[in-house]
UniProtKB/Swiss-Prot annotation:
Protein's membrane topology: Multi-pass membrane protein
Native species: Neisseria meningitidis serogroup B (strain ATCC BAA-335 / MC58)
Similarity annotation: Belongs to the TonB-dependent receptor family.
Protein function: Probable receptor, TonB-dependent.
Name of the protein in its database record: Probable TonB-dependent receptor NMB0964
TBDR beta-barrel domain boundaries: 171-758
A Pfam family this chain is assigned to: TonB_dep_Rec_b-barrel
Length: 758
């Protein structure tokens, strides 16, 4: 794979920092390598809202911890109670929170839209850089409505320093990192620097360069390493801010390029197309040949839906007959402006403005040949104002505009290469607000968000008219318009100075995506042929959470119970199962799915308890469990009888797909000296036997990780040397939450690295 021109840029950013290390001064700040629960009033605060509110189940993961974690967001957060990963090789991994993923979890890049297409497919990387971040915040409650609707499991905000918000001490500050890993042969360098320019300007540059090979796997098909699990990444960013006594305004430009393989990627169905529309409908409604997503219920051939395929010899998913191995070539350019100002107008305490634009593209390739390409252009603007207290009330209100233009097209002009998603445009207009009332030991908080969506496809109306030989009435080609209204209420009771009890209730509404509305094409990553449903309604959920947190001198615990009940839950309904000669004969075959809606019910528990028997030792246990069911599924039309009658067949309730198995953990951290820490983390992930249709049992596994850190402050900065061993038992690890649940994750791996702050 050819090196990109971004590599010299990244390396130059890292080298800029080296001569400046001598300017750093000694400090006594220790490195916190733990996940922080937001319980005590003096704990670190989230940066996501002007009110700095939190519930007892919120989490903050420090940047120091993230420097030693995987660079993909899902893998970096995996292990936090309630959070698992949906891994897809070495290049993509999304968080699975309380059994939810994708569009039911909002991921932000420092309060702004990520602008990627990670929600579209599990093999698409999320465009955030955890290895360069200041912290990652997992937030729940009313504050999530400041950013989007439908966040039933929470909001993940990756806070960074691309746009400086304060002047660096002594005129310069920064950080450098280097690490090597054996499991995936990873080599990673990262760094960033802030340079004061005069009294008010700050220049920031940062970069990351990562190169990794196929990762090691134990006992898998006589392979030592998983083919096509390699991943390379290069990121560079430059920002400039003006900082004054009342606030700041800054801009930044970031350029990220990824190249990573696609494991278990098969071309077996390349010569297939969907047969889902009645032949008579294709003749009478010729626009369906151009735009098959315009089909209605009466157009669907429920007697024999399925795939029609030409001959293609591919008995092994790893034995590609095409020109080369499958991989993704990705580039993301981000332009950003942030500003925050104190006392901007009479009656208001603070103003926050955030503008960002993303130009995202990736090509799916076989060797050097482009097979599919994905585009997403995002423009986002939001303004948030915090008003002065009105009695006990403090509040923050704002508006947001979001526009996305995206597509998923094929580069091959074959009839069977149906584009999965045509050029489309989505516009969101949102109004949001959060109000908070405080008493001595009790806080009541409410939030609201109203979100209007307009989703449209650009049709060639002249071509439709020309092909309409029989003057058949045309369907509505207008935009899909809907409005989501979400509300949340949370109470936080500090019944002692160390205790926090939070009760949160919400009604959330999520609008269907253009993929769910208009898709019509093969999706190899999920082994499906997707058919959109332009008649989808908004998804609704009623949610409740009870969380208890305690933080004392020796004990710390955080416990949470939750339930999410959905109406109009959007899911992919399989059509080619037992409905004619084209039906699948094996659960591993490609499914023909159409987006539909049903009820759903998710509930679970998560928690962690820590105890310090001595000032130098800390032991703890953790665990999580989630259960998900699809309920009240719509009846499917049966086969037409000899009299022309078509009965409807009721569908039984089902287990929700890809719900993580239960997990228990044991943790030990020891401060061996003032400079040396050691930690042990053991997890038991149980087998998942509660299976959705077409799923197979995922075996459980034991995970043992060890690590040690050595810290030293010198005149050259704060140094932190670390070593760690992951999956020390070399277990075969399979994740039920992944679309590749039968593909193992990385085996035993040893990592060594160093970070220095100055």
């Amino acid at each position: 794979m050819a090196q990109t021109t971004l590599k010299p840029i990244v390396l130059s950013i890292l080298l800029i920092n080296t001569p400046l290390l001598a300017q750093a001064h000694e400090t006594e700040q220790s490195v916190d390598l733990e996940t922080v629960s937001v319980v005590g009033k003096s704990r670190p605060r989230a940066t996501s809202g002007l009110l700095h509110t939190s519930t007892a189940s919120d989490k903050i993961i420090s940047g120091d911890t993230l420097r030693q974690k995987a660079v993909n967001l899902g893998d970096a957060l995996d292990g936090v109670p309630g959070i698992h990963a949906s891994q897809y090789g070495g290049g993509a991994s999304a968080p699975v929170i309380r059994g939810q993923t994708g569009r039911r979890i909002k991921v932000l890049n420092h309060h702004g839209e990520t602008g990627d297409m990670a929600d579209f497919s599990p093999d698409h990387a999320i465009m955030v850089d955890t290895a360069l971040s200041q912290q990652v915040e997992i937030l729940r409650g009313p504050v999530t409505l400041l950013y989007s609707s439908g966040n039933v499991a929470g909001l993940v905000d990756v806070a960074d320093g691309k746009i400086p918000e304060k002047m660096p001490e002594n005129g310069v500050s920064g950080e450098l990192g280097l690490r090597l890993s054996s499991g995936n042969l990873e080599k990673l360098t990262s760094g960033g620097i802030n340079i004061g320019l005069g009294k008010n300007f700050v220049l920031h540059t940062e970069g990351l360069y990562r190169k990794s090979g196929d990762y090691a796997v134990p006992r898998y098909r006589n392979l030592k390493r998983l083919p096509d699990s390699h991943a390379d990444s290069q990121t560079g960013s430059i920002g400039l801010s003006w900082v004054g006594e009342k606030g700041f305004i800054g801009v930044a430009y970031s350029d990220r390029r990824d190249q990573y393989g696609l494991p278990a990627h098969s071309h077996e169905y390349d010569d297939c197309h969907a047969d889902i529309i009645w032949q008579k409908s294709l003749i009478n409604k010729r626009y369906l040949q151009l735009y098959p997503h315009l089909l209605t219920e009466e157009d669907i051939d429920y007697d024999n839906p399925g795939l029609s395929c030409g001959f293609h010899d591919d008995d092994n998913a790893h034995a590609h007959t095409h020109s080369g191995r499958p991989w993704i070539d990705l580039r993301n350019k981000r332009y950003e402006l942030r500003a925050e100002w104190k006392q901007p107008f009479p009656g208001f305490e603070a103003l926050r403005v955030h503008l960002n634009r993303n130009d995202y593209r990736h090509d799916e390739k076989a060797g050097d040949a482009v097979e599919n390409f994905f585009n997403n252009q995002t423009q986002n603007a939001r303004i948030e104002l915090r008003h002065q207290p009105i009695g006990r009330l403090k509040g923050s209100w704002g508006v947001q505009y979001l526009q996305q233009k995206s597509s998923a097209l094929s580069a091959i002009s074959e009839a069977v290469k149906q584009p999965m998603l045509l050029d489309n445009k989505v516009q969101h207009y949102s109004f949001f607000g959060v109000e908070q009332a405080n008493w001595d030991n009790f806080t009541l908080e409410g939030g609201v968000r109203v979100e209007k969506q307009k989703a449209s496809i650009q049709y060639d109306k002249a071509l439709i008219d020309r092909e309409n030989y029989y003057n058949h009435p045309l369907p509505d080609l207008g935009a899909h318009r809907q409005t989501a209204r979400s509300f949340a209420l949370s109470g936080n009771w500090y019944f002692t100075p160390q205790h926090k009890l939070s009760l949160t209730a919400s009604h959330q509404e999520r609008l269907p995506s253009t993929q769910e509305l208009y898709a019509h094409g093969k999706h190899v990553a999920t082994n499906t042929f997707e058919v959109g449903n332009k008649h989808l309604n908004k998804e609704r959920s009623n949610n409740i959470e009870l969380a208890l947190g305690y933080e004392g001198d020796r004990w710390q615990y955080n416990l949470a119970l939750y339930r999410n009940r959905f109406g109009n839950y959007i899911y992919a309904q399989t059509l080619n199962d037992g409905r004619g000669p084209k039906s699948i004969e094996d659960d591993s075959e490609m499914k023909l799915v159409r987006y539909n809606q049903s009820g759903a019910d998710f509930y679970g528990a998560e928690g962690e308890i820590y105890f310090k028997p001595t000032p130098r030792y800390r032991i703890g246990v953790s665990g999580d469990y989630v259960r998900g069911r699809l309920k009240n599924l719509p009846s499917l039309p049966g086969r037409e009888d000899a009299y022309g009658n078509r009965p409807f067949i009721a569908q039984d309730d089902q287990n929700a797909p890809r719900v993580p198995a239960a997990r228990l953990g044991f943790h030990l951290k020891a401060s061996l000296t003032d400079r040396i820490d050691a930690n042990l983390d053991y997890y038991r992930v149980f087998a998942q036997n509660k299976l959705a249709r077409y799923e197979t049992r995922t075996p459980g596994h034991h995970m043992l990780n060890l690590g040690a850190n050595y810290r030293r402050n010198t005149r050259y900065g704060e140094w932190n040397w670390y070593v760690k061993a992951d999956n020390l038992l070399n277990q075969s690890v399979y994740a039920h939450s992944s679309f590749l649940s039968d593909t193992p994750q990385m085996g035993r791996s040893f990592t060594g690295g160093v970070n220095v702050k100055f």
